[in-house]
């Protein structure tokens, strides 16, 4: 049997609260698909530009040589969007490091970090659990002295 050459691909994830997005990035023609649909069709439309931030920052020429397939689940709309943009940015950096060259990877990383650090680094904040004696994590029920 003839062995197939290994495809140049990387897999990266992005997280925000409980939303997780996994991006498969491989050599291609610049297609970006989100849950099987083109990323241009993502709803809600207002949040679509947040997803396009890595593309707009780095220019389409850097994405022209790669295809990205993104799967996202968990969380709400906004959390999913932040997880998606993080996974896109991390996948492109990893692809350039592994298959292109270290210099262009460093340029990409510097541009992204200068704009918004959360494009590459996850936000560690999580929801605090509710405690007894109140409605939420910190608020307490009203106290009466008389």
From Swiss-Prot:
Protein's name in the database: Small ribosomal subunit protein uS9x
Localization, UniProt: Cytoplasm
Source superkingdom: Eukaryota
InterPro entries according to UniProt: Ribosomal_Su5_D2-typ_SF, Ribosomal_uS9, Ribosomal_uS9_CS, Ribsml_uS5_D2-typ_fold_subgr
Family (UniProt): Belongs to the universal ribosomal protein uS9 family.
Pfam families documented for this protein: Ribosomal_S9
Single GO MF annotation: structural constituent of ribosome
Biological process (GO), any one: translation
Key words, A-Z: Cytoplasm, Ribonucleoprotein, Ribosomal protein
A Gene Ontology cellular-component term: chloroplast
Gene: RPS16C
